[in-house]
């Protein structure tokens, strides 16, 4: 901050707080006057009285026209607005000391020391083997990665240090422009005291000053923004180097892990081959009978089972030959090769998986076929039953009329016995619904009064309801058969039934409704 700016700020504070300052002057003068007693302190007492009088004159000055102009001149909203804009630009540069990259520089130094240690750790000529070659390769990779990290740390440290200097320079420029506006406030305030034209001249001068200061601050601010973008691009490049080093380390670790696996496989194969050779020699010296189909390593018949364990009859360590799916154990012992055993295991696993996948599918297809067959059988039975009922309904009217004519001339009881025997024989030959006729005859046999008067009970059924109404027990599958009959009216039909559970032979008559086959009303014969 400049000296003129400090003076201007102090003067503005005094003008704004003029009443408080006048009161302070008055209190200080009265204090000095009260305590300055005696001839030697007379001058001090006079100074106190003068200071008290000045407080009154100070207040009177600001109440005058000149004092009011000074108050108005001190209150410059134009300069205050310019300083506020510059302060906002300065806040974008942060608060406090910027990061100078010192810690990244220290990290680069430590990594350089680690790189020097790795550089001195190369194998010497005394160590020459496959292990030394592997160690040399790994050490080279570590040294390369350390150098890359050192370079990245140095780049970041340099960028942060340069940006810290740029931020400091920008802050200085912005502060200088704000201070310049504060210094010019004394000039503009004096210009505003000029009568008539002072206020207009002050306003024009302040606008020009703010334009100049804010313009210079804006140029510096935009320059700082461009430099910050460049610095950010360099930092992003350094981040890419860090990520490349990390990815290289991961790839190296993965390669080492993958490279260790093949080395163990030849060892296992060699052990297996040696064991096979020893077992072969022992079998040539001491032959052992091959296990039969019941005690050997048989596989399951499903096509996917793995071979079972070796038979207890053979010697320990004797390899068993896996038998084909669905067959027993091998009949002759054969040396099992590692490749054949692996292929057999793979085939067994594949068969198990395929069996597990296709098993549910076969069950579903079988269920669908079974359901289709049941549906076809039910449809065939329903069609045959409907055709049979339709034929009975069509032949019923003629038989009923003939029986009615004969009943008028002959004795009802005698003719009823004959008709009963006749119908009984027809019912057995045709094989049509014996249970329905037994229920109808049972209802006719229970009512003795209607048996004595057959014509009187022809209009009602066993429940006492009108036989012209459809029966409540009509099966749904007779609706199609009922549509074939177009006749109207009711005709009596003599139906004979032989009760299988008793020696009683009862003749009963039934009235069939032509419109709805199966609807019957029983009456006595």
Swiss-Prot record:
Residues 244-341, 375-494 are annotated as: Disordered. GO terms for cellular component: cytoplasm. Coiled coil: none annotated. Residues 292-306 have a biased composition (Gly residues). InterPro entries: ESX-1_EspA/EspE-like. Residues 274-286, 411-440 have a biased composition (Basic and acidic residues). Keywords: Cytoplasm. Residues 307-319, 332-341, 375-397 have a biased composition (Low complexity). It is found in: Cytoplasm. Residues 248-258 have a biased composition (Acidic residues). It comes from the Bacteria. This is ESX-1 secretion-associated protein EspE. It comes from Mycolicibacterium smegmatis (strain ATCC 700084 / mc(2)155) (Mycobacterium smegmatis). The lineage of its organism: Bacteria, Bacillati, Actinomycetota, Actinomycetes, Mycobacteriales.
């Amino acid at each position: 901050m400049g000296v003129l700016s400090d003076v201007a700020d102090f003067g503005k504070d005094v003008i704004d707080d003029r009443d408080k300052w006048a009161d302070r002057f008055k209190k200080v003068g009265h204090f000095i006057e009260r305590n300055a007693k005696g001839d030697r302190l007379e001058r001090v007492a006079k100074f106190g009285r003068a200071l008290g009088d000045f407080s009154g004159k100070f207040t009177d000055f600001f109440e005058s026209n000149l004092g009011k102009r000074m108050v108005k001149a001190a209150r410059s909203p134009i300069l205050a607005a310019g300083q506020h804009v510059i302060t906002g630009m300065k806040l974008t540069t942060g608060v406090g000391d910027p990061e100078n990259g010192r810690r990244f520089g220290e990290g680069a130094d430590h990594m350089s020391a680690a790189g020097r240690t790795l550089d001195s750790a190369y194998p010497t000529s005394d160590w020459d083997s496959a292990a030394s070659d592997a160690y040399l390769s790994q050490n080279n990779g570590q040294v390369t990665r350390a150098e890359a990290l050192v370079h990245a740390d140095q780049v970041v440290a340099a960028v942060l240090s340069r940006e810290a200097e740029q931020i400091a320079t920008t802050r200085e420029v912005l502060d200088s422009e704000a201070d310049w506006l504060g210094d010019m406030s004394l000039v503009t305030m004096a210009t505003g005291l000029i009568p008539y034209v002072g206020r207009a001249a002050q306003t024009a001068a302040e606008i020009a000053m703010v334009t100049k200061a804010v313009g210079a601050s804006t140029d510096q601010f935009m320059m700082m923004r461009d430099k910050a973008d460049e610095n950010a691009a360099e930092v992003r490049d350094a981040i890419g180097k860090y990520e490349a080093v990390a990815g290289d380390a991961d790839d190296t670790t993965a390669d080492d892990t993958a490279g260790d696996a093949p080395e163990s496989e030849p060892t296992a194969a060699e052990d297996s081959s040696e064991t096979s050779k020893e077992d072969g020699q022992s079998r040539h010296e001491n032959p052992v009978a091959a296990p039969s189909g019941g005690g050997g390593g048989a596989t399951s018949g499903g096509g996917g089972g793995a071979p079972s364990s070796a038979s207890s009859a053979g010697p320990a360590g004797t390899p068993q030959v896996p038998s084909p799916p669905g067959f027993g154990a091998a009949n002759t012992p054969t040396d099992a090769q590692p490749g054949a055993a692996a292929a057999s295991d793979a085939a067994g696993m594949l068969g198990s998986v395929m069996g597990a996948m296709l098993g549910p599918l076969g069950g579903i297809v079988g269920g669908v076929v079974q359901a289709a067959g049941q549906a076809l059988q039910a449809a065939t039975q329903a069609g045959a039953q409907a055709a049979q009922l339709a034929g009975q309904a069509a032949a019923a009217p003629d038989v009923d009329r003939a029986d009615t004519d004969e009943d008028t001339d002959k004795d009802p009881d005698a003719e009823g016995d004959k008709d009963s025997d006749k119908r009984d024989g027809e019912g057995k030959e045709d094989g049509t619904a014996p249970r329905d006729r037994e229920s109808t005859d049972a209802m006719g046999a229970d009512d003795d009064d209607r048996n004595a008067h057959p014509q009187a009970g022809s209009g009602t059924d066993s429940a006492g309801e009108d036989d012209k109404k459809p029966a409540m027990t009509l099966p749904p599958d007779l609706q199609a058969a009922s549509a074939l009959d177009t006749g109207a009216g009711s005709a009596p039909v003599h139906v004979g039934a032989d009760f299988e559970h008793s020696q009683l032979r009862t003749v009963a008559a039934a009235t069939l409704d032509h419109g709805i086959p199966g609807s019957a009303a029983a009456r006595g014969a």
